[in-house]
Structures are given as structure tokens and as C-alpha cells.
Amino acid sequence: TQKIVIDAENEVEQGGHVIEDEEETKRSSANKPEWKRYYHLVVIAKNQVGLGNLFTLVKKSYKHGFYRFPRIDYKMLKEHSEGLIVSTACVGGLASGLIYRQFSGLRFDELRPDLMNSLDDYNPVMSRLENMADQFVDCVGRDNFFLELQFNDLSAQHLTNRCLIDLSTKTGIPLIATADSHFPTSDKWQARELYKKLGWMGAKLDQSMLPKKEELKCMLYPKNAAQMWDEFKQGHNQYDFYHGSEELVRDAIERTHDITWQKCEDTWIDTSVKLPHFGTPEKSAFRMLSDLVKEAMIREGLAVKPVYVERMKEEMSDIKYLGYEAYFLAMYKIFHLAENRTLFGPGRGSGAGSLVNYLLGITQIDPLPYGLLWSRFLGRHRTSWPDIDTDAGDRDALIDASRELFGDDAVIPVSNFNTLKLKSLVKDIAKFYGINFTEVNKMTGPLQDEVMPHAKDENQEKSVFVLKHEDCMKYSKGYREFMEKYPEVGKHVETLFMENRSIGRHAGGVIIAPPEDLESTCLLYTSPSPRDGLLS
């Protein structure tokens, strides 16, 4: 097991999950800043119950709260608050939004701590923050709500810090200190900027569009306690309001560590197989399957042939021993309902070696005349679930049949993550730097043939081969010379290789499970329509 600390904030560019005033959102215009329309919230699972509630909140934020962005509200949070810890997040959080609202006539870079010197501004801001704190305490309890300090070069962040320090002093709500993390280490800032630009490759882009280090507003990467203290000291030297708050900040840094290692228990993701429920008090799932198989044996005239009877008994005995009757019933019902809507292939692979599959109409091949073995498909010696391979002319007909049988909430299409593979990544980075396409293509074309035989032999790889930068540097002279000629390309390839590029819908993958089991799984929806749902 491992400790899982999940941040529902994500990055500013990716939206995130929000606490939002829906009425204000509906009245807002396109000209209003983002921080006036939705807010981030950090939610941490401190135990297994909390992890399930966090997954439920994510699911509901997409399925029931989607309005431009996935959202939750106080009521939803309170209903699923057990086992959760909440903090106020970064400058995109609700606390910051309530502060900045007071200065709506200013640009973001004009927000600074000394704006709170005026009581005409200070009092209404603190009143809003106290009301916000009361609502969060009501949702998750006083021991599970924290005010979040961050230390960076944004003057608006120091404005937020000033208000939250005062709020903590007044209410006793504890502070924590965190670091927004948009890239892994301080030297990876340029790779992140390039990563963002790669999503816009349709536009005319070149390396001049990458900012210089001194142009960055802040360096957002994970920091240890000593680095956090150094960041605070820089702010301490710049802003007077930090004077006298040293002990508060030191405690906040230590408290962040304590939350992870003392308040959060070990949690795990349940990866066990969940099948739809079959059977009734009068008839078990295995009895249902047995009746279907016996009826088919009689219908096909096989019940009088001893070799078929023995094979049927062997297979049914193994199925009962392994507890797989629900799997075969589910496959039977899906195929039976969809058979008039689409064409099926005869079946292929080891599944064609099952007489039960043939009798249920899942495959169209009688395995006995061809000597096909049941043991290659299933047996008591096998620890993995059976895998039936067949072809269907209409994928959606199968999915629709599954929805009719088990319900929309029990049939969820699967998402997949598109990653930055080596050859396409090299081409994209080279394009960004204006390197001639012919030169790049000449180098990348033969890479697979040059590298794969050597790399697979050295690494003893038997799985699908994936080109890696280090293997290409070792076994491809053309690749090595290209990287020596254009070192900036190689530098970014090492950092960005296999990073997620986008999320999409798997071409055919579908999860079928009881809705009550899916409740504990993190569900993401791109739209309220179940057909468009994505499971993560």
C-alpha cells in the first residue's frame, strides 16, 4: 500500500474542480477574470472512506455539476465529507477570489498586500473570509479545514497570505504551507513552457515565444521544508506584514508534513474484478448458467453423445470452482440481445476452445471436431480471468445492448491517455525550433529498424517495443549526430518523453460493473450524457 494524497486543484490551465457561486457564474460576462467565475479547492483523502468520497465528488462534479467546468458546491461537499481534508488552494482558490473581488477594478498584477491597509477594504474582505471558513468548517469539521499559504513572486499571493494569516489569528483555524507545482524541478521550467506550446502546433510558433527565465512570474515546483522557509524569508524581507509571523509560518510548514504522515492513513485502489449480479433467491447464477447449457445440449442433439457430456461437465465444474458463472452469463446476455443488431465473427483465440461458449452462442465453432483444448482457455490452474476474442460489425450495438441489460450507470466507456512518443515528440520539438522537416524525417524514418533488434536483445524485452531516447542514442548513429547538432531538442526530449498529451475515449474499451461498485471508482465525464462518459 501507499499513501495517496490527491489534489483536486490540478493546474490553472486545466480548470480543476471548483466551489462556485452558480448565480454569479450565470450572470458573468466573458470579460470577467477567471478567478471571479470559478475557484479551485484542494481535497485530500485521509483514509479509505475519504478516497471513496473523493472519487464520488469527482464523479458528481462532472455528471451533475458541470457548467463549463466540473464543479462541486458546499452541499455536495458536506454530503461526502467523511475522511476528507480541505484547504483553500492557491491564488485560484475561493479565499483568494473573495479577497480579489474587493479590488475588481485592478489587474491581477496590480494586487498587492498594502491594499489591505484601508479598513474600508480590510473589513469586508475579512467578513467574507470568515463566512467562507464557517461554511467549510460546517462541511468537513474544524479539524479537517486548513488555510493555505504559498510563497512565490506573485504580489497577489502575498495579499492572500496577509489575509489568511489574519484570519488564522482571529479564528484559530490552522495554516499550512504548500508549493504550487507545475514542473518537477527548478531547471525544468522551459520544458513545461514548451509542453504548453506543443498543444498549439497548428499556429505559427518558434523558439522566440518561449519566455526567458527572468520573465517568469514565479517558479512553481515542489519544495522541501528548507526551501519553503527560504521562500518565506524572501517575502519577509519584502513585506512588513510578515514580521512577527515567523512562528506561525514555521508551524504551517511542519503541519503540512504532519498531515501527510500523521493524519493520512495508507489507502489503496480496489482493482478486484466486479461483475454484474445474477441469480435470485430461487435460482443461483450457476443454476441459471447450467440450465442454459443443458437446453443448448438438447437443442443441438449433443446430450446423447458421451464425449460432449463429459466435456460439458468438465467445463462447468471448472467454472463453478473458479466462480466465473456471472462472467459467462453476462457475455451470453449481451450477445443474445445484440445478435439481431449486428453481425458477429465465429470467434478466435483460446475462447474458441470452449464448448460452453459454443453452446451459449458466444462463439460459432464446435471445439471438439477440431481438437481445441478447454485448458488453453480456462482451467483451475489459471489465475487470470478468461478472455473471449470475437469480432462485431457494430461496436455501438454491443454497448447499447449492454446498457439495456445493466443500466447506463453500470456501463462506462474507458478513457485513454495519449502520450508523447519519441518520434512524434522529436518532430514536434524540431518543428518548434524551425529545423528542416526533411532532415528530421530522414533521421527518424529508420529509427525503429536500427534500434529495435539491439535494444530488445539487450533489455530482454518481450512486450511491445517502445523507442526510448537512451536506446536511440546508443544504437542509432543518425539520431546521435542529430542530437549533437541540436542539443536543445535532446534536452527537451529527455524531459517530455511519455508525458500525457491528451485524454480521449478508448476505441472499444468498456467497463461493466454494478453501479454500487463503480461509486468507489474515480469517474470523469466530458459531458452529462452517459454515452460520452469517460472512466479514469
Regions from the PLM with identified roles:
Residues 1-527, 531, 536:
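Alpha-helical scaffold/interaction cores of sigma-54-like transcription cofactors
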